[in-house]
Amino acid sequence: MYAEDLTSIESPLIEDKGDFDIADYWDIERITQEHLDRGAKIFTLGGDHSITYPIIKAHSQKYSKLDILQIDAHCDLYDSFEGDKHSHACPFARIMESGLAVRLVQVGIRTLNTHQAEQAERFNVDIHQMKDLELSRIPKFENPLYISLDMDGFDPAFAPGVSHHEPGGLSSREVINLIQGIDTEVIGADIVEYNPNRDFQNMTAYLAAKMMKEILGKMI
């Protein structure tokens, strides 16, 4: 089994740890930290996007300078959403206000509003909206990179199995090319927001598996 850059992911370096027993939100940070302490790189399958904050909290203990590539229809920069500061709509506000990442680059955004634009300016977020997207303009990363892929970053034609459909999104080829263009160390990743109840003939599941393969090829 190979990624498109011919990296084999049938490797003893890759081990499926199965499902974790999460009783409390912060168990995510603890379990991530335990694996990082053993020298592992971690690829997490969500779950909604709220999981990314505790995962990055754990990574920040190991990586003092961390870049994040977020592929998403939404900025997820709300200070609070429906009274919850740890909502799926808030993880990157928590990450950036805590200084856990040097740089946050968002690709695929097509739901920007005034509040999140203000948050993006506050945290110096590099947003690449779909309305004027040119993948060639996405700058190179200089620090260890964490990739967070929200499946609703894709156009619903490619990924119907998400909770929040946002037309006008990324194609599968655009995201593959974006991943293949990365030339810095990828130290971790997540894929989030897959909703099997809204999928059609497992289209989104197959796409998520393809993206996992391509990202794993960058991690080993």
Protein language model regions, located:
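Conserved alpha-helical scaffold segments that buttress catalytic/binding sites
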Residues: M1-I220
